[in-house]
Amino acid sequence: MNTSHYSVLGHTVPYPKVYDPSLLFPISRAVGRTQIGIGVVLPFVGEDRWHAYELSWLDARGKPCVATATFHVPCDSPYLIESKSLKLYLNSFSAEVFNRAEALRLRIAADLSACAGAAVAVEFGLPPVGGGDKEISLDRLNVDIEDYGPPNPDYLSNVAQNFVEEMVEETLTSTLFKSNCPVTGQPDWASVTVRYFGVPIDHEGLLRYFISFRHHAEFHEQCVERIFQDVLQRCAPQCLAVEARYTRRGGLDINPLRTTSEMAWPLSVFRDPRQ
């Protein structure tokens, strides 16, 4: 079983001088999911969307080319891709010759698919920087905070209502989210968005819950799945989508999305201003 302890993460390694797909390191999703009660049947659909800012290769005449790219790793793949290994892998193209950029795209797609154990879509370019027009920022709340971990789902609740329960659709966001790499301890900063339809969720409790990740060590993808599970179990929305847009490290940022229904709950694809 592949775990992060056997990866290059947290180790000093030389940058590759030649193309090497064996640098890619898969980590089983099952390990983290077992810890939060997720079995073989997933309660969500979604993807891990990677933005790559440092991609370079040589054309047929030896002239360097540069590009940005977006990778879409399906959340039902058996493996997630460890970030430092992906950085090193992409850097291994710096002296590789391609007659066409399309040949490079196909090569990357094939290698990432082999690592993840499922089809990974690759495209050149990045989504625009933006934000949702109807988002409600939780950062505006005037609250006292004393709990920074471990993640505490007891903060999550619905707003108390009298008589008939009113159903609402809301998109709640916070830029205050922080978790930590489970191997190196480095901070991982993100903007987190929760979109739902159901009985109103208590905003202050959700913000406190987000901040309770501040000392928590877990991979990006696992944090989002933990949030999804906790909100679904504690607040019981009819529809739910959770997305985190993590800030860039090593020329990459990752944006895990988990949603109850891909058709009914597509979130706008954009980059956070901090990315």
Swiss-Prot record:
This is NADPH-dependent 7-cyano-7-deazaguanine reductase. It catalyses: 7-aminomethyl-7-carbaguanine + 2 NADP(+) = 7-cyano-7-deazaguanine + 2 NADPH + 3 H(+). GO terms for molecular function: preQ1 synthase activity. Keywords: Cytoplasm, NADP, Oxidoreductase, Queuosine biosynthesis. Catalyzes the NADPH-dependent reduction of 7-cyano-7-deazaguanine (preQ0) to 7-aminomethyl-7-deazaguanine (preQ1). The keyword Oxidoreductase applies. Pathway: tRNA modification; tRNA-queuosine biosynthesis. One of its GO terms (biological process) is queuosine biosynthetic process. Substrate binds at residues 81-83, 220-221. Homodimer. NADPH binds at residues 83-84, 249-250. One of its GO terms (cellular component) is cytoplasm. It is found in: Cytoplasm. InterPro entries: GTP-CH-I_C/QueF, NADPH_dep_7-cyano-7-deazaG_red, QueF, QueF_N, QueF_type2. It holds the Pfam family QueF.
